[in-house]
């Protein structure tokens, strides 16, 4: 009987893991997302080539 309960609990855990849907990450109003590409925002300046070439 313990084996049957263990298998049932294992299957229930697997089904719960597949059924889990994470909540969408909604940015808070008034806050801009952190820039990720060069040239966007004050913390991520554009990459400049050296002036000697």
Curated annotation (Swiss-Prot):
An example Gene Ontology CC term for this record: extracellular region
Principal place of residence: secreted
Localisation per UniProt entry: Secreted
GO BP annotations, alphabetical order: defense response to bacterium; hemolymph coagulation
Segment forming the signal sequence: 1-19
Protein origin, superkingdom: Eukaryota
Keywords, comma-separated and alphabetical: Antibiotic, Antimicrobial, Immunity, Innate immunity, Secreted, Signal
InterPro entries assigned: Abaecin_antimicrobial_peptide
Function: This peptide has bactericidal activity.
This protein's name: Abaecin
Source organism per UniProt: Apis mellifera
